[in-house]
């Protein structure tokens, strides 16, 4: 394996939104999207970068959306939590097909399917070059997978949270709706709060801020974007 001395990050926590997995579909998992992401991850693994992964559930069921439709919010969030396990298992299976050693750890017990999360075990797996996929969010309703990503990032002592989305970074407004939206290359934690930018929910963002954990938001669909970030290129938006 090649040395990673020329890379600025040694251990990363990659957060991928569920919407990224659905690709061109309106619902579900697009296998081609999964394969593309796995190839991006495999590229950085070849240089010794350790990768923890959290996947959202928006391609299947989002708790907040179900709640708006009349489903009890706690039940809605439980459905979202289970959906992250589905996404995580699909990701692991594609990783297996690319000969990438990976492990799914769930915040809730799912005996016979995946191991229950333990941070010491997770760090040991990462140190042995396994991709650790953290499923089931925080294990509790009312918390997003962004909160789970920041929490796991802190626990495993990751160097940075990399939030892979379908846009190039953080904008003043939704760039798909507003052509005049301003793109931000760098922001402070204070900037994000003052400008009320939708980077993450406040609980997740506060976790990262309080532990001085930098966040970079980038377009995971851009080829080699993940590689460029760990190499030190100024891809997307950096928040610190």
Swiss-Prot record:
**InterPro entries assigned:** AceGlu_kinase-like_sf, Asp/Glu/Uridylate_kinase, Uridylate_kinase, Uridylate_kinase_bac
The UniProt entry's GO CC annotations, sorted and at most eight, read: cytosol
Predominant localisation class: cytoplasm
Q: Is the keyword Ribosomal protein assigned to this protein?
A: no
- Stated EC number for the protein is 2.7.4.22
Binding, ATP: 15-18, 58, 62, 165, 171, 174
Instruction: Output the Gene Ontology terms for molecular function.
Output: ATP binding; UMP kinase activity
Q: Fetch the PANTHER family from UniProt.
A: URIDYLATE KINASE, URIDYLATE KINASE PUMPKIN, CHLOROPLASTIC
Query: What is the protein's known function?
Result: Catalyzes the reversible phosphorylation of UMP to UDP.
Family (UniProt)? Belongs to the UMP kinase family.
Spell out the subunit comment.
Homohexamer.
Q: What is this protein called?
A: Uridylate kinase
Q: What is the lineage of its organism?
A: Bacteria, Pseudomonadati, Pseudomonadota, Gammaproteobacteria, Enterobacterales
As recorded in Swiss-Prot or TrEMBL, the protein's gene is named pyrH
